[in-house]
């Protein structure tokens, strides 16, 4: 997904049909409101109805969060950055992730839209249920929270400066992925798997361009409009 120009303003038109185009956009609070009740209910169900101990539920929940970080890396590297050859495959690749690389500051497409998100998460839960049985009721909520954390971190990286100094490497890693080399830095919420698989940036060797980074952030007025 190499583009002649990366646009820091505007957004891609993915579909000509205005209704389909509308479904490609979402607000972070919509996704949180969809999945937070599911997380709470499944944890309640695993303890109250399946009689998991609090320790067992917490272990499965934590394992789900950790598994998300691996899933995030694999999907980003091998699915979102799949090298498409045919025109149809390139179109699919662009719809899934290419539009984000061409318009990285499009605030309406920093979370997966609700409809495909619900379909995909339902399929993932079904697979987990088949593989792990009732354990999925405590494991899947952790996986979902991992996704929400990742998506929120992704949103924050494109919207604001890191709120804490220790978060700065996470921000720099993703900026370098977008603006220097999209074959590295596939982890967004964590560098762990990039380090394991040798795709991490050497942040100490990368010169930071503060002026260029400033151009990536949303302006105060933009943020206020988004949060309304």
Show the residue positions of the predicted features.
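Interfacial helix-loop-helix junctions of multi-pass membrane proteins
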Residues: 157-170, 183
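N-terminal start-of-chain detector that recognizes signal peptides
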Residues: 51-53, 147, 163-167
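Non-catalytic, topology-defining segments of multipass membrane proteins
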Residues: 1-140, 152, 183-228
């Amino acid at each position: 997904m190499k583009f002649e120009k990366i646009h820091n303003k505007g957004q891609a038109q993915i579909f000509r049909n205005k209704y389909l185009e509308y479904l490609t956009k979402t607000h972070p609070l919509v996704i949180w409101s969809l999945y937070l009740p599911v997380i709470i209910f499944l944890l309640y169900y695993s303890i109250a109805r399946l009689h998991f101990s609090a320790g067992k539920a917490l272990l499965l929940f934590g394992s789900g969060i950790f598994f998300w970080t691996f899933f995030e890396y694999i999907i980003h590297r091998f699915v979102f950055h799949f090298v498409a050859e045919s025109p149809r495959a390139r179109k699919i690749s662009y719809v899934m992730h290419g539009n984000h690389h061409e318009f990285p500051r499009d605030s309406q497409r920093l979370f997966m839209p609700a409809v495909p998100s619900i379909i995909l998460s339902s399929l993932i839960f079904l697979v987990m249920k088949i593989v792990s049985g009732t354990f999925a009721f405590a494991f899947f909520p952790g996986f979902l929270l991992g996704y929400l954390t990742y998506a929120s971190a992704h949103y924050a990286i494109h919207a604001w400066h890191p709120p804490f100094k220790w978060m700065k490497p996470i921000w720099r890693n993703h900026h370098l992925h977008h603006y220097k080399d999209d074959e590295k830095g596939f982890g967004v919420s964590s560098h762990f798997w990039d380090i394991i698989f040798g795709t991490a940036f050497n942040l100490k060797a990368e010169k930071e361009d503060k002026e260029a980074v400033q151009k990536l952030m949303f302006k105060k007025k933009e943020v206020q409009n988004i949060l309304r």
